[in-house]
Amino acid sequence: MNRLPSSASALACSAHALNLIEKRTLDHEEMKALNREVIEYFKEHVNPGFLEYRKSVTAGGDYGAVEWQAGGLNTLVDTQGQEFIDCLGGFGIFNVGHRNPVVVSAVQNQLAKQPLHSQELLDPLRAMLAKTLAALTPGKLKYSFFCNSGTESVEAALKLAKAYQSPRGKFTFIATSGVFHGKSLGALSATAKSTFRKPFMPLLPGFRHVPFGNIEAMRTALNECKKTGDDVAAVILEPIQGEGGVILPPPGYLTAVRKLCDEFGALMILDEVQTGMGRTGKMFACEHENVQPDILCLAKALGGGVMPIGATIATEEVFSVLFDNPFLHTTTFGGNPLACAAALATINVLLEQNLPAQAEQKGDMLLDGFRQLAREYPDLVQEARGKGMLMAIEFVDNEIGYNFASEMFRQRVLVAGTLNNAKTIRIEPPLTLTIEQCELVIKAARKALAAMRVSVEEA
């Protein structure tokens, strides 16, 4: 039987939520009630599958750990009052930490004036952010399209490349194996994981995948496309594959891809949604090889962990296809004043505090510690790898990876797996993580591995 809508129920639920939002703290009974409510509502109204995922990466299969608030700049607090060092970083959102005061202040100040733009008048912060990104990004990148997420930024990049290359008779895209570019129809066509692709087949035509890091495979694909008349519009790739398991290409790979794109007249799209904004020790990962893309995709950390925002930045030559009709690709909330305020403040913090350099220093410290643990526990750990504050620990099998996440949860350190590689746990903390917290994370990882070895020996 169809359920009738209930205004009274909706009003009561929204009022209850607003009451919780107003509260800074909860007593013990309120915490227990909130946990029960959240679990029930996820099961009945969000997606019960998320409960099982959360259960797999928390201590003892307890999915009752409900996030309540940020603790310090680099920590989270649940409804039980337990504080966790955040080594997940919202999958790369919190580069400048949780509730960074500079970012929060900028958003609050803008909120007091104008939260959203009229859609008709010129909005100043969008212009200022576009100018800032033109100055910050490498090469001839000049014009920015703003959206709300990484997937949207990739979608815009693909459409922009199509609009530019279609008059030239170039319609094919080359992506790489193991890559993750998002889950909208266009972005999913570039994504390489069958689990996400199969339910939505057929996807957009014209996408090919080649092994990541293999420059000869890239050259072969470009040559084959040219011979068959399927000329390549663009090559799209991540400088370091995040969801693929923090996979680093061989040195010089990006430079070689750039040369091939120039040789075959293909655009180079770099998806820096996860690697950008200082994460790898440079503001953008492509700067490690001084590579200049034609189109650059940003999101995640661009909003400072306070507002969602994505950006697609392109050269004037490429972006000019939108000049005659700027409404060819738009979004209602993209580039709104609150999001732009957050992004401008985030960039300011990254530069003022030199956080990319800090990411390199602290990332080296963490990675040295994880590699030492890999040497101490070769029966459990296959490899520790990474660049800057984007790291991964790969285990010998999937189950060990899940157990490690649970043990780290017991040690009050939050980590999680990657979408495309179940054996790999990603370490992606805020760039603001302190040296003392870095040391605590390494100690927690050592305790977790020691406990896991005992469990294996007793089994």
Curated annotation (Swiss-Prot):
Q: GO molecular function: any one?
A: pyridoxal phosphate binding
Q: Which reaction does it catalyse?
A: an alkane-alpha,omega-diamine + 2-oxoglutarate = an omega-aminoaldehyde + L-glutamate; putrescine + 2-oxoglutarate = 1-pyrroline + L-glutamate + H2O; cadaverine + 2-oxoglutarate = 5-aminopentanal + L-glutamate
Q: Where is the signal peptide?
A: none
User: Could you list the residue ranges forming a coiled coil in this record?
Assistant: none
A GO BP term here is: putrescine catabolic process
Please list the residues that carry the modification N6-(pyridoxal phosphate)lysine.
Answer: K300
Q: CDD domains under this entry?
A: OAT_like (cd00610)
The biological pathway it contributes to is: Amine and polyamine degradation; putrescine degradation; 4-aminobutanal from putrescine (transaminase route): step 1/1
Q: Which UniProt keywords apply?
A: Aminotransferase, Pyridoxal phosphate, Transferase
State its Enzyme Commission number(s).
Answer: 2.6.1.82, 2.6.1.29
The UniProt record gives the binding positions of pyridoxal 5'-phosphate as G150, T151, Q274, T332
Query: Needs which cofactor?
Result: pyridoxal 5'-phosphate
Q: Which domain of life is it from?
A: Bacteria
Could you tell me what this protein does?
Answer: Catalyzes the aminotransferase reaction from putrescine to 2-oxoglutarate, leading to glutamate and 4-aminobutanal, which spontaneously cyclizes to form 1-pyrroline. This is the first step in one of two pathways for putrescine degradation, where putrescine is converted into 4-aminobutanoate (gamma-aminobutyrate or GABA) via 4-aminobutanal. Also functions as a cadaverine transaminase in a a L-lysine degradation pathway to succinate that proceeds via cadaverine, glutarate and L-2-hydroxyglutarate.
Instruction: Report the sequence similarity comment from the record.
Output: Belongs to the class-III pyridoxal-phosphate-dependent aminotransferase family. Putrescine aminotransferase subfamily.
Which NCBIfam families has this protein been placed in?
A: PRK11522.1, putres_am_tran
In Swiss-Prot or TrEMBL terms, this protein is called: Putrescine aminotransferase
Q: Which organism is it from?
A: Shigella flexneri
Q: What is the name of the gene encoding this protein?
A: patA
